[in-house]
């Protein structure tokens, strides 16, 4: 059982890694399912055992990239002990992610504007699952600035702010619109701080 499951996960991982490399090299639009299976060294039919289509692979990759970016950012921010309030910590996390994507625009192109946050329903369904998001949610819920708000309200606000920042990051870094990212950072971070300040 374990061996069979292990082989399944290995094939899925091979497909994801092949797709990721190809998307970085030539872009998703110029990559076919056949290209992915050829690079992964698996039969074309195997692809459809794991993914409905190329879009499903892209979504899985975006989830993986998003998770890694968020994990790295949180680890870095934890070391910044001078950050005392939650809004400043949130800004630091976003800034770390933006800087990582600015330095690696190929990854930004794969991610597009679709930073994927683990669903709150998944967290609520299994409190022991997804340790990163459970840890983050605990930090958020114990922040004085979030007092009086429900978990869902907090999650909605944070994901909306994060999605806004990622969309602006994509446009600013790759297209220079509405301005370059350095010019947009103060605007974004002011919005984040205002949205997360304690309610009176």
Go through each PLM region and give its residues.
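Basic, helix-initiating cap at the start of DNA-binding domains
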Residues: 1-26, 30-39, 56
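Short, structured helix-loop boundary elements
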Residues: 12-13, 33, 55, 59, ...
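Solvent-exposed, amphipathic alpha-helical segments
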Residues: 14, 18-25, 68, 72-79, ...
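Short hydrophobic/aromatic patch on the recognition helix
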Residues: 41-51
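Alpha-helical DNA-contacting segments of helix-turn-helix folds
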Residues: 51, 58-68, 72
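Hydrophobic alpha-helical connector segments
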Residues: 60, 74-103, 157, 161
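Amphipathic alpha-helical packing segments from all-alpha helical-bundle domains
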Residues: 67-74, 100, 119-146, 152-159, ...
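Amphipathic alpha-helical segments used for helix-helix packing
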Residues: 88, 100-120, 137, 170-174
């Amino acid at each position: 059982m374990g061996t069979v499951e292990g082989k399944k996960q290995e094939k899925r991982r091979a497909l994801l890694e092949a797709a990721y490399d190809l998307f970085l090299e030539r872009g998703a639009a110029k990559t076919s399912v056949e290209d992915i299976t050829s690079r992964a060294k698996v039969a074309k039919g195997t692809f459809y055992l794991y993914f409905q289509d190329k879009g499903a692979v892209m979504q899985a990759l975006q989830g993986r990239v998003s998770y890694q970016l968020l994990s790295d950012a949180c680890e870095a921010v934890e070391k910044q002990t001078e950050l005392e309030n939650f809004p400043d910590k949130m800004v630091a996390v976003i800034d770390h992610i933006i800087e990582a994507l600015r330095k690696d625009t190929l990854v930004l192109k794969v991610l597009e504007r679709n930073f994927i946050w683990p669903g709150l329903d998944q967290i609520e369904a299994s409190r022991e699952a997804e340790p990163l998001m459970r840890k983050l949610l605990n930090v958020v819920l114990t922040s004085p600035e979030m007092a009086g708000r429900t978990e869902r309200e907090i999650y909605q606000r944070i994901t909306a702010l994060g999605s806004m920042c990622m969309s602006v990051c994509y446009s600013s870094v790759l297209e220079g619109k509405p301005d370059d990212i350095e010019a947009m950072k103060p605007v974004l971070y002011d919005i984040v701080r205002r949205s997360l300040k304690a309610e009176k």
